[in-house]
Amino acid sequence: MDNKPAQERRETWVPGAVIVGAGPSGLAAAACLAARGVPATVLERSDSLASTWRHRMYDRLALHLPKRFCELPLLPFPEEYPTYPSKDQFVAYMEAYAAAAGVAPRFGATVEEAAFDAAVGAWRVRLDGGEVLMARWLVVATGENAEPRVPDFPGMQKFAGCAMHTSEYKSGEQFAGKKVLVVGCGNSGMEVSLDLCRHGAKPSMVVRNTVHVLPREMFGLSTFGIAMALLRWLPVQLVDRFLLTAAHLILGNTGQFGLRRPKTGPIELKNLTGRTPVLDVGTLDHIKSGKIKVVGAVKEMTRQGVRFTDGKEEQFDTIILATGYRSNVPSWLKDAGDLFTREGISKVPFPNSWRGRNGLYTVGFTQRGLLGTSSDALNVAKDIHCQWRERDRSAINVLEISNSSF
């Protein structure tokens, strides 16, 4: 902990909660607190809210789930929005959401450390400029996708072409006619491969492990919506069996195209490991036609391309790493107790992962997307509000006792 005098640290007590992160999770937490009359200071390291969506997502991205499953508490999406809003529409929704709730984040505020001070019963949040904010409650809302996850492949520095993470990828337009290797077969890897194909590139996609691919819609309805409805009445295993049977009827045997399915069903696997099934938006047809080539795991990179684990070598102009993101919580949060793993993932399973000790809360670490974010935000706001209200009662009692003594 910083031992400088308070005046050098520019120590400031702030009312209510400090929320770290101004993405969907942080905005939802702040809005739900504001609705209950609890103030919050929202800290955001970038220059805008929803910065990951605004700056790190590719142009063709749209929500994979229908908008009714992705809206945040207190404000639905505009009726004129399509079923699957685009990236730009989602960012506009976030802007409107913050404005409607009166949430004004402090931009350019990077948290270097947050630690609980037992002596005063509050959290000390130190910013990169030296300022220290003191608050009774700390809400961690930086999310599970704060930093790009970039694997260190052997020979990576040798590659003479362009290598980038999907956080830098915007459109396949610049890759027309080029051979591109996409490393990763999750939703991002699948969509980037599709985008490259539609812009005239020659993509190959690395599929290292088994993967569940489901149609985004079944029988004219959202696959996710069908699954959620069935789970109200049926056990996970039966719902998984239904989804896989329907997927086989609609998509065929994906295994014959290099997309082998795990033995565990898609929902059960998601619950156990956090691995999300791919919702196909057209990529599979291009794999079947051969326009997108499925390849195995990468052993190392070479000057002209890569060497695969089966010993084969292939040349590529560009390598795009669709290897996901990671949490940055371990780099700045101290005294997290039993709430986070060393990798910054919640130790506590949903729906009880939102509350820690000493006034520590989290929003958006459920591995359940925006639905989990909304659930967390509502729970956090309710819990903090109860304590905030109790504090007001205590203050009134003290005032009444003081007045009665005269």
UniProtKB/Swiss-Prot annotation:
**Reaction(s) catalyzed by this protein?**
indole-3-pyruvate + NADPH + O2 + H(+) = (indol-3-yl)acetate + CO2 + NADP(+) + H2O
Cofactors (names): FAD
Going by the UniProt record, its keywords in alphabetical order are: FAD, Flavoprotein, Monooxygenase, NADP, Oxidoreductase
Residue sites binding FAD per the record: 21-26
Q: In which tissues is it expressed?
A: Expressed in coleoptile tips, root tips, leaf blade tips, shoot apical meristem, vasculature of stems and flowers.
Q: What GO biological process, any one, is recorded here?
A: auxin biosynthetic process
Enzyme Commission designation? 1.14.13.168
Name the enzyme group at the top EC level. Answer: oxidoreductase
Which GO MF term does the entry hold, naming one? N,N-dimethylaniline monooxygenase activity
Q: Pfam family of this protein, just one?
A: FMO-like
- InterPro entries from the xrefs? Auxin_biosynth/cation_transpt, FAD/NAD-bd_sf, Flavin_mOase-like
Q: Where does this protein hold NADP(+)?
A: 184-189
Extract the Gene3D superfamilies matched here.
FAD/NAD(P)-binding domain (3.50.50.60)
The UniProt function text for this chain reads: Involved in auxin biosynthesis. Converts the indole-3-pyruvic acid (IPA) produced by the TAA family to indole-3-acetic acid (IAA). Functions downstream of TAR2 in auxin biosynthesis. Functions upstream of WOX11, a transcription factor that promotes the development of crown roots.
Q: What else is known?
A: Calli overexpressing YUCCA1 exhibit high levels of auxin, low regeneration frequency, overgrowing roots, and abnormal root morphology. Plants silencing YUCCA1 exhibit severe dwarfism, inhibition of shoot elongation and root formation and elongation.
UniProt-listed PANTHER family:
FLAVIN-BINDING MONOOXYGENASE-LIKE PROTEIN (AFU_ORTHOLOGUE AFUA_4G09220), FLAVIN-CONTAINING MONOOXYGENASE
According to its UniProt record, which protein family does this protein belong to?
Belongs to the FMO family.
Q: What is this protein called?
A: Indole-3-pyruvate monooxygenase YUCCA1
What organism is listed for this UniProt entry? Oryza sativa subsp. japonica
